[in-house]
A protein has these predicted regions:
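Charged- and aromatic-enriched interaction segments used to assemble
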Residues: 85-222
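Acidic, low-complexity/disordered segments
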Residues: 80, 96, 227, 235-268, ...
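Extended Gly/Ser/Thr-rich low-complexity repeat segments
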Residues: 47-61, 90-102, 200-211, 302-306, ...
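Intrinsically disordered, low-complexity terminal/linker regions enriched in Pro/Ser/Gly
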Residues: 101-135, 257-262, 272, 278-280, ...
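Extracytoplasmic/secreted envelope proteins and their assembly/folding machinery
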Residues: 163-166, 229-230, 272
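Beta-strand-rich assembly/attachment modules of structural machines
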Residues: 1-114
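Oligomerization/assembly interface segments of phage tail-like spikes and tubes
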Residues: 28-43, 76-90, 169, 232, ...
């Protein structure tokens, strides 16, 4: 059965309903942003109300709002593409506070050390809800309560893409992030997510063909960006610079080295934390077609960010659900899920090497 779509404005005021459409595909991500694409036949009731900045959501899932960014109209159909609501963060970079001095060097680094949730909220406040330049503020966005979850690590950013900083915090600490609409209060909320471990106990979630909730799976073991030994540089210059290493036991072909620059850090313990954050294990992942049947169903028994047990090809792995692509077409829903970190992409490698430092 095809679900209708509700349409609202950025102010969360309802604009109308789209009772039917040809197809809807959207990707939810725990650490990254995700995307969506909607196809509607011209003449469908409500089609002419579709426009950029429109929020779309399924009536039974009002917390999963999609933000329209591109509209293409041809003779037969309208194609709408965009991002989940958290994609608002793609419109901002990390701008550090200005400092007095040379007008051509008026910005330093935005450094923060603390638990993962505090790090998320620090960079969200500095660039979304309470920036130094009021013109950068996202209207109607508020921060969730800080519960101080996640590992304590040092972070620094200087004109980095905000979504990349959030993705780094997430992949390093296991906590996710999102922006969700609070329809009752009429505001948008930046929230930090902590997935549930569903690998043991009465709430255990197991996915396998035998249980009828998975139809095929593929396994990937990716060592492209693996780093097991990190040299880190702190304060000082040239031969006087503070240098230390972590993970310095591997040797031979098993040794994969990396560099982390944490300028201005003179505390050895903080420098070691920065080096440890640069460690990057092999990225193993499982991609599976999920079924809306059998025991243990997506959206009912487990959700994005949860750690579940996946069994396929006589292999078993406990892994976090990091991305789900949902497709609504021809009256049915299909699901494609990624557990664990996906394979390293060229864009990811370039990003990592360009940033070079702990950021």
């Amino acid at each position: 059965m095809m679900h209708s779509l509700m349409m609202a404005g950025p102010d969360l005021r309802l604009r109308g309903e789209l009772p039917q459409y040809a197809s809807l595909r959207f990707k939810r991500c725990f650490w990254e942003v995700g995307s969506f694409q909607l196809t509607v036949k011209r003449g469908t009731p409500g089609w002419d109300s579709l426009s950029r900045e429109t929020l779309l959501y399924l009536p039974e899932r009002p917390e999963t709002a999609l933000l329209a960014e591109k509209i293409t109209v041809d003779e037969e159909k309208v194609t709408v593409s965009g991002v989940p609501l958290k994609g608002l963060c793609k419109r901002r970079i990390c701008v550090p506070q200005s400092v007095q001095g040379d007008q051509y060097d008026g910005f330093g680094w935005d450094r923060f050390t603390g638990d993962a949730e505090s790090a998320y909220l620090h960079y969200a406040a500095a660039n979304l809800t309470d920036p130094e330049d009021a013109k950068r503020k996202i209207p109607g966005l508020v921060l969730s309560e800080n519960r101080h979850r996640g590992a304590v690590l040092p972070w620094q950013a200087r004109f980095d893409k905000l979504t990349e900083v959030f993705a780094d915090i997430g992949s390093a600490t296991g906590l996710g992030w999102d922006i969700v609409p609070d329809w009752k209060a009429g505001v948008l909320r930046f929230v930090v997510r902590e997935g549930v471990d569903r690998t043991t106990g009465s709430r255990r979630a197991v996915l396998s063909r035998r249980l009828g909730n998975v139809d095929g799976a593929s396994w990937t073991e990716d060592g492209t960006a693996e780093v097991g030994t990190v040299y880190a540089g702190g304060s000082g210059e040239d031969e006087d610079r503070l240098i230390l290493s972590v993970g310095n036991t591997a040797e031979g072909l098993a040794r994969r080295e990396g560099w982390a620059s944490l300028n201005g850090v003179s505390d050895v313990d903080m420098l070691r934390l920065g080096a440890e954050r640069k460690l990057s294990p092999r990225k193993d992942s499982v991609t599976a077609e999920l079924l809306d049947s059998g025991l243990c169903r997506y959206g009912r028994d487990y959700d994005l960010g949860d750690v579940v047990t996946v069994v396929a090809d006589d292999r078993q792995r406990n892994a976090r659900l990091t991305a789900v692509e949902e497709t609504y077409e021809d009256g049915k829903r299909t699901l494609k899920a990624t557990f664990g970190e996906g394979p390293v992409t060229l864009t990811g490698l370039i990003r990592e090497r360009m940033r070079g430092s702990i950021a």
